[in-house]
Amino acid sequence: MAESSDKLYRVEYAKSGRASCKKCSESIPKDSLRMAIMVQSPMFDGKVPHWYHFSCFWKVGHSIRHPDVEVDGFSELRWDDQQKVKKTAEAGGVTGKGQDGIGSKAEKTLGDFAAEYAKSNRSTCKGCMEKIEKGQVRLSKKMVDPEKPQLGMIDRWYHPGCFVKNREELGFRPEYSASQLKGFSLLATEDKEALKKQLPGVKSEGKRKGDEVDGVDEVAKKKSKKEKDKDSKLEKALKAQNDLIWNIKDELKKVCSTNDLKELLIFNKQQVPSGESAILDRVADGMVFGALLPCEECSGQLVFKSDAYYCTGDVTAWTKCMVKTQTPNRKEWVTPKEFREISYLKKLKVKKQDRIFPPETSASVAATPPPSTASAPAAVNSSASADKPLSNMKILTLGKLSRNKDEVKAMIEKLGGKLTGTANKASLCISTKKEVEKMNKKMEEVKEANIRVVSEDFLQDVSASTKSLQELFLAHILSPWGAEVKAEPVEVVAPRGKSGAALSKKSKGQVKEEGINKSEKRMKLTLKGGAAVDPDSGLEHSAHVLEKGGKVFSATLGLVDIVKGTNSYYKLQLLEDDKENRYWIFRSWGRVGTVIGSNKLEQMPSKEDAIEHFMKLYEEKTGNAWHSKNFTKYPKKFYPLEIDYGQDEEAVKKLTVNPGTKSKLPKPVQDLIKMIFDVESMKKAMVEYEIDLQKMPLGKLSKRQIQAAYSILSEVQQAVSQGSSDSQILDLSNRFYTLIPHDFGMKKPPLLNNADSVQAKVEMLDNLLDIEVAYSLLRGGSDDSSKDPIDVNYEKLKTDIKVVDRDSEEAEIIRKYVKNTHATTHNAYDLEVIDIFKIEREGECQRYKPFKQLHNRRLLWHGSRTTNFAGILSQGLRIAPPEAPVTGYMFGKGIYFADMVSKSANYCHTSQGDPIGLILLGEVALGNMYELKHASHISKLPKGKHSVKGLGKTTPDPSANISLDGVDVPLGTGISSGVNDTSLLYNEYIVYDIAQVNLKYLLKLKFNFKTSLW
């Protein structure tokens, strides 16, 4: 739901004389008409108004076509002022002469369009994305930059030809001409003439003075007399309504004090707002239309805001109510007896009536999109098609690459990107490891601009891999620096601060830290005792976080509100000097994953004062006492996040530094252990899922949190299938994102409102469960310094891992199984077997023993990310927890296998830059199979069935099956199964009891990716 507060512009009568005009810097007198553009605050996670005098507002270049719809507060103005705003907007804003924007005979100057000579060669045309050379004529449209909304309206530059091509999208109306551009008169004569030819104004035949300046709609011209009469009546009714409300407000100001007005609201069971004008508005609304009854959904207070009545209540402690209506329920407004002494109130008799709304606002209420469709800054691949993944991106190349510049340029352009020679204009840099290490002047510019550097292989991988663009950036990254890679933002067509482009899954705002490594390094340097001192305090080397009674006085709080689009954090620390009795309270706040925010450091008189102030702030922000054992979430209040302060970092570090120097394990096993315990791979996996590593580092992944998140997804799945209210979906989404902190940058957190979003988050939690196991193993266990870190980690897996001789019969059978069952449709890569390991998990054979006698046992494939294998080997293949939604899996919650190697290999999530994957072969006791052709969310197998088989159109040739240790190995080449009415291309096998699986082999595979580009 798009609330009125989402609007880019606001108009009102100045509540005081304190605000200064952003144009002329003069104060804006109290009660005078003022207008504002709403901009993202750089200091906190929210928007603030930039106020202007009415006349100054139009001079800075704001284009408004429909004030009724585009400007918050418009309908609360006096009628005459509404007409003033409308006429000024229709006339194109500021004029060549005068200040009102109306009444001048001079040609109107368009404040939001400009022409000038480029002052440098740094600007880029937003049409063709090419550089605009210094001294060239360039044209601009003032818009909100989706990447920097806090800057408000800024010039977005175009080549004249590109501007002409995008004329309609940019809102340069047919009747506008080049001579109306701001700065046109300063151009040379020949440039003026050229622009006049390119941008002629189309004049309507026989247009009379007083006709609309706006392009007149042909349909509007032909309006019937009946329709015109209807519009005229509505206009008169709106004017009469407005006059009545303002007459009452004017009289109330004369005869009633603010306290009197508050008492009137309380007597009529209405909430009392803050601010004199808001109180007056609500009393007048009640007197004219009746006292508002509580919201039917949450019993909250309804409040009029421009285009409708909005509920200000909360459905739950996590989510505000979304009710919005133009016809709220009311009762008679009652004036208490004691107020009848006031002559005006005694005489006032208003017939209860319904509020009338202009047709534009009625339409906007009906067409209001849900939060999930709200636009946000465009980011990587946000407007790219599948065959043009680098659309809107500019690529810089540095150093000697394996291909010449023309070849690289052709590759980039074929993928939708463009070459650039300037670091500060680049989205991405392609170079070599040698160039990064050399760090010449050009590379320093790249680092200064915080541009990620990736290897040349990235270009091949983009077309060959099924991974997301962000996964590929991470797989090929060469630089320790680099913010989230962004495309050039798609143009904002209307000046609303929103992009019409589809949102990218990985869209982000400016990131706060220069990559994960740097911020983590900073935190390690400041770790003292129980918690890390925030470096922004400036006291990381001279103070520590106070710990008293086993409780660390440090808190990180989170608050997500999808309706408002906020994703806020609040940090609070009590710091004690390392040497002296000095104490400080440090707090910081802002938007997760961006530079938006601020902080404050206060020195306190004593330890007691510091503790008291800390506890007061904590209670103010959360609604809970600091020492409270059971936390209760309150509406609009923050929720505490579990944060890893780095206590276990040293334990992890010991087990990842200089591994292999003392190991007694075979080299292939050593390499395998290093691979599955690679911390950087775990972090990359979390970043791919947009998890905020600052708020939820590896060390604080907990089963409790993940299981709670599964439960929320189950509720989401139920709510979606039952068609529950928007409020319930919102509530669940807010809870999920608060529990598992995500980094969305400047875009709104997306609603979890469909099966696909549930599926994606279920997959994320499945992977997080295994990452949690791996990291828990890393930081726990033996501290024996005499052992090699690899051997220590190997022992934690409780799995016997032996290298299979390449020349053995079983190795030959397995290689044949890989070769023969590679599906023809999985042709993006070939598979090469590097190592084969025979594995025996502790206790698994014993667990499998009852199923050893079951008929129909097969050796089948199971693929997974490398980050999941520590969990798989130490705990076995597991079934999703009871909390997980059953619809997150095609055939319900079970363990899935395949008889085609490439079907399972796709789940390894490899890429050209990271081509090594791991895959399992398990003995699976299938018994009697329940055969299915389409998705079925199995919760219990039919009687007499032991497993499910999803029937595919292709199956390994059964005549080629062989037996290995009494187990069937379906290693025949793929042939038609004869089953055509199925949704599956290849077979799937699912068991619902973990004891039916006995893992036998683990294969290390190299994915040799192909490409059709060269």
From Swiss-Prot:
PARP-type Zn finger ranges: 9-93, 113-203
Residues given in the record as Zn(2+) 3 binding sites: C295, C298, C311, C321
Active site: E988 (for poly [adp-ribose] polymerase activity)
Effect of T316A: Strongly reduced poly-ADP-ribosyltransferase and ability to regulate chromatin compaction
Regulation: ADP-ribosyltransferase activity is regulated via an allosteric activation mechanism. In absence of activation signal, PARP1 is autoinhibited by the PARP alpha-helical domain (also named HD region), which prevents effective NAD(+)-binding. Activity is highly stimulated by signals, such as DNA strand breaks. Binding to damaged DNA unfolds the PARP alpha-helical domain, relieving autoinhibition.
Motif (Nuclear localization signal): 207-209, 221-226
Record annotation: effect of changing M43D: Strongly decreased homodimerization
Catalytic activity, reaction form: NAD(+) + (ADP-D-ribosyl)n-acceptor = nicotinamide + (ADP-D-ribosyl)n+1-acceptor + H(+); L-seryl-[protein] + NAD(+) = O-(ADP-D-ribosyl)-L-seryl-[protein] + nicotinamide + H(+); L-aspartyl-[protein] + NAD(+) = 4-O-(ADP-D-ribosyl)-L-aspartyl-[protein] + nicotinamide; L-glutamyl-[protein] + NAD(+) = 5-O-(ADP-D-ribosyl)-L-glutamyl-[protein] + nicotinamide
PADR1 zinc-binding domain: residues covered: 225-359
Post-translational modifications: Poly-ADP-ribosylated on serine, glutamate and aspartate residues by autocatalysis. Auto-ADP-ribosylation on serine takes place following interaction with HPF1. Auto poly-ADP-ribosylation on serine residues promotes its dissociation from chromatin. Poly-ADP-ribosylated by PARP2; poly-ADP-ribosylation mediates the recruitment of CHD1L to DNA damage sites. Mono-ADP-ribosylated at Lys-521 by SIRT6 in response to oxidative stress, promoting recruitment to double-strand breaks (DSBs) sites.
Effect of L768A: Increased auto-poly-ADP-ribosylation
Location of ADP-ribosylserine modifications: S499, S504, S507, S519
Crosslink feature (Glycyl lysine isopeptide (Lys-Gly) (interchain with G-Cter in SUMO2)) location: K192, K203, K249, K467, K486, K512, K528, K748
Annotated positions of the N6-(ADP-ribosyl)lysine modification: K521
Modified residues (N-acetylalanine): A2
Region span, Zinc ribbon: 290-332
Reported impact of H826E: Decreased polymerase activity, leading to the production of short poly-ADP-ribose chains
Effect of K320A: Does not affect auto-poly-ADP-ribosylation
Keyword Nucleus: yes
Region of interest: Disordered: 198-233, 361-385
Binding of Zn(2+) 1, residues: C21, C24, H53, C56
Family: Belongs to the ARTD/PARP family.
Role noted for this protein: Poly-ADP-ribosyltransferase that mediates poly-ADP-ribosylation of proteins and plays a key role in DNA repair. Mediates glutamate, aspartate, serine, histidine or tyrosine ADP-ribosylation of proteins: the ADP-D-ribosyl group of NAD(+) is transferred to the acceptor carboxyl group of target residues and further ADP-ribosyl groups are transferred to the 2'-position of the terminal adenosine moiety, building up a polymer with an average chain length of 20-30 units. Serine ADP-ribosylation of proteins constitutes the primary form of ADP-ribosylation of proteins in response to DNA damage.
Name of the protein: Poly [ADP-ribose] polymerase 1
Biological source species: Homo sapiens (Human)
Protein encoded by which gene: PARP1
